[in-house]
Design a protein with these regions (language model features):
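Cationic, low-complexity basic patches in intrinsically disordered or flexible, solvent-exposed regions
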Residues: 3, 18, 22
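Sec-dependent N-terminal signal peptides
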Residues: 30-39
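Boundary at the C-terminal end of the N-terminal hydrophobic targeting segment
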Residues: 43-49
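Outer membrane beta-barrel
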Residues: 49-62, 75-190, 209-211
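Outer-membrane beta-barrel pore domains
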Residues: 58-74, 110, 121, 125, ...
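Loop-centered beta-sheet repeat module
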Residues: 184-233
Length: 372
């Protein structure tokens, strides 16, 4: 009987291939482990004082009444959930930060989840003077009424009611004068892209903000595409003045169609006076006027034929000592004039009263431990 001898060359080949695969896998695992250890060491060395994560919730609940010429508007009266938002922000590296804020109370069938996202952007700071941001951010338009966060809005002008201020885009910022002044250039989606029904419409914005002893300007020049290839020009001048416990702002905005420039035919003026009676109580008075007498259509925010005024006031009470995260408010305003937009927010002979409770809750905060 013939003896069968093993094929040592075949066995040797199989063993060599197995050893090669094993060594390759070990090298890959070692490389991954080395990268992770390297990143960890770099993080520990450079991110000592960084905030990794802040997580919080913003909430506001109101009871309100609205009347038109003395007749109650039932659908806009009663208890209302005005704001329910969550936010995350922090540092990914010493030069790279992130911010995310989602409004949970904007759940409309014609909106996506991303439509209810206020902020979702990254900011890169190569130096202490230059900032580069990209993502969903506020359209950079001047004015202090426009600059209000949704949770702080009580009653606003027709212009501010009709502009979709959170859009995708990119911006570059330069800080100067000991960081007291900032210039921002921004390229983003048009705030009127939904009205134009064109995603491919844009806004080009240049914003200057400053902080001086008693004066804080918030000015901008904007070229806003309201229809495909058609632009509005904004000149928005926000001016904040502070004197002790009293402060007030005056916003002046002129709007004109680029093909037919005009001055003070289409404009909005807003003024607000605020006074801190004590650490717990603040009162304010506010008025706005929207005006558009341009014959041709073009401005989607304040339509032709509009000349409408809103005026009112209110108070804010902060129960916590040296903390304004919890707030109780009561406001009242009246509106009179004509609105060229039949579906506009401001209506002639409109009366509005509102009381409510809002609070800001910082639920979690993680910081990188300092290296000992």
């Amino acid at each position: 009987m013939q003896q069968v001898r093993p094929n040592f060359s075949l066995i040797s080949l199989i063993l060599r291939k197995f050893a090669h695969q094993l060594i390759t896998q070990m090298r890959i695992k070692y490389l991954i482990l080395s990268i992770m250890l390297s990143l960890s060491a770099t993080w520990n060395a450079t991110a000592q004082d960084e905030t990794l994560l802040n997580f919080g919730v913003l909430t506001r609940f109101d009871y309100q009444r609205e009347y038109i010429d003395g007749s109650p508007i039932r659908e806009n009266s009663g208890f209302k959930g005005k704001n329910l938002s969550i936010y995350f922000n922090g540092d990914l590296t010493p030069r790279l930060s992130y911010f995310y804020r989602q409004r949970l109370n904007r759940a409309h069938k014609d909106e996506s989840f991303f439509d209810a996202t206020d902020f979702l952007y990254l900011t890169y700071r190569p130096t202490d003077q230059w900032y580069f941001s990209a993502g969903k951010q506020t359209v950079s338009i001047g004015g202090y009424e426009y600059d209000l966060a949704p949770i702080d809005i009580y009653f606003i002008s027709e212009f501010s009611n009709n502009i979709d201020c959170y859009q995708l885009g990119a911006s570059v910022s330069f800080l100067f004068n000991d960081r007291n002044d900032e210039l921002v250039f921004q390229f983003c989606q048009s705030p009127f892209r939904n009205i134009a029904e064109k995603e491919d419409t844009y806004s080009y914005n240049l914003l200057w903000s400053g902080a001086y002893k008693w004066f804080k300007p918030l000015w901008s020049v904007n070229m806003v595409e309201y229809a495909q290839g058609k632009f509005m020009n904004y000149i928005a001048l926000g001016n904040m003045f502070s004197f002790g416990d009293a402060s007030f702002f005056v916003d002046v905005m002129n709007r004109s169609v680029l093909r037919d420039p005009s001055l003070f035919l289409d404009f909005t003026v807003v003024g607000k006076f605020m006074y801190d009676i004590c650490d717990h109580v603040s009162v304010f008075a506010k008025a706005s006027h929207d005006h558009n007498k341009i014959n041709s259509s073009g401005d989607p925010s304040v339509m032709p034929g509009t000349s409408i005024t809103r005026a009112g006031g209110g108070f804010e009470f902060f129960p916590l000592k040296q903390n304004k995260d919890l707030r109780i408010h009561a406001v009242f305003c009246k509106t009179f004039g004509s609105n060229g937009n039949p579906e506009g927010a401001l209506v002639d002979k409109q009366t509005y009263a509102n009381i409510g409770l809002s609070w800001r809750m910082n639920l979690l905060s993680f910081r990188k431990k300092q290296k000992v």
